[in-house]
Amino acid sequence: MNIHEYQGKEIFRSMGVAVPEGRVAFTAEEAVEKAKEFNSDVYVVKAQIHAGGRGKAGGVKIAKSLSEVETYAKELLGKTLVTHQTGPEGKEIKRLYIEEGCAIQKEYYVGFVIDRATDQVTLMASEEGGTEIEEVAAKTPEKIFKETIDPVIGLSPFQARRIAFNINIPKESVNKAAKFLLALYNVFIEKDCSIVEINPLVTTADGDVLVLDAKINFDDNALFRHKDVVELRDLEEEDPKEIEASKHDLSYIALDGDIGCMVNGAGLAMATMDTINHFGGNPANFLDAGGSATREKVTEAFKIILGDENVKGIFVNIFGGIMKCDVIAEGIVEAVKEVDLTLPLVVRLEGTNVELGKKILKDSGLAIEPAATMAEGAQKIVKLVKEA
């Protein structure tokens, strides 16, 4: 689950992580009123959308007067902002974050992530702040420093200080930086985050260490422990199909292709998309039906896939373990009838009750193309979509 920058900074502030003063605004008039509350001559007007790259896309403005705050607010509100993370359709700006300006001395990058290779939380940091960390990793990987954190001990003060020294935090600010990192780690753990990224972290002329921009993602599987976090969810920033999928316990992510996919298991789903790509097709989505799909769930999955007007064909790839192939087959037949499917449909079943499942599909009299393997199924759906 994602939240807005201003919401993340409120969490930081409440847990002892230093951030500049800021207020959220929904109108240009409100933006000016919020700016008046600051003891500053410089203000930062920031578009609030669930995507990075806002600065490069023109979504962050520096205002040196209240009149400029109003001008920038009017310019941004209602605008569709396109960044490298939004896709070409962009996202509409519906709210702004008005922040007090600060005298930046140097920008840095700091992030806490879960390292799948070590199964531990890793602190990453670089003195190349303000740019995409992927770009730094590609061009100057030697400028990225890491600390692997023992889950029993947590982030140690000496690790925080070592990172601060490695990224050349000024000596007079090292202790503040270490305290900052320890507080940030506490946010990561206490709020069950999957990522906490500060880019940039800044030191100021006054020797302070502050969050200038932040990204927080939460582990969806832990949200039941954080009702306060769930309340921060902005459904207007999410794909309606993804929202509908979550209601039916389906994992759905929209992509920009034209072949809809319904699979059980995240690993098989990714392998299916890779296979479609290998044979020259483009997946329209990632959809994991999970291990306990019912007929109703399969029907809802079809409806969600067909909610994407770009879909020109569907590939169902199911391995029946807990999920029995005959139940899936019955669900597919019912779904095809209910949604009155006219698009090409290829189904590959394997596992428990597979022969019974195949018989149900064959006896249905519907235009369902069977496939014996994932590769065969991918080839068939790519061919059918191209011929359609």
Curated annotation (Swiss-Prot):
Family matches, as InterPro entries: ATP-grasp, ATP-grasp_succ-CoA_synth-type, ATP_grasp_subdomain_1, Succ-CoA_synthase_bsu_CS, SUCC_ACL_C, Succ_CoA_ligase-like_bsu, Succinyl-CoA_synth-like
Annotated binding of Mg(2+), by residue: N199, D213
EC number from the UniProt entry: 6.2.1.5
Subunit structure: Heterotetramer of two alpha and two beta subunits.
Function per UniProt: Succinyl-CoA synthetase functions in the citric acid cycle (TCA), coupling the hydrolysis of succinyl-CoA to the synthesis of either ATP or GTP and thus represents the only step of substrate-level phosphorylation in the TCA. The beta subunit provides nucleotide specificity of the enzyme and binds the substrate succinate, while the binding sites for coenzyme A and phosphate are found in the alpha subunit.
Pfam families with a match to the protein in the record: ATP-grasp_2, Ligase_CoA
Positions bound to substrate: N264, G321, I322, M323
Family membership: Belongs to the succinate/malate CoA ligase beta subunit family.
Keywords annotated in UniProt: ATP-binding, Ligase, Magnesium, Metal-binding, Nucleotide-binding, Tricarboxylic acid cycle
One MF term in the entry's GO annotations: magnesium ion binding
Pathway the protein takes part in: Carbohydrate metabolism; tricarboxylic acid cycle; succinate from succinyl-CoA (ligase route): step 1/1
Protein's UniProt name: Succinate--CoA ligase [ADP-forming] subunit beta
Binding site for ATP: K46, G53, R54, G55, E99, C102, E107
The protein's required cofactors: Mg(2+)
Any one GO biological process: succinyl-CoA metabolic process
Source superkingdom: Bacteria
Cofactor remark: Binds 1 Mg(2+) ion per subunit.
Gene3D superfamilies noted in UniProt: ATP-grasp fold, A domain, ATP-grasp fold, B domain, Succinyl-CoA synthetase domains
UniProt domain ATP-grasp: residue ranges: 9-244
Reactions catalysed: succinate + ATP + CoA = succinyl-CoA + ADP + phosphate; GTP + succinate + CoA = succinyl-CoA + GDP + phosphate
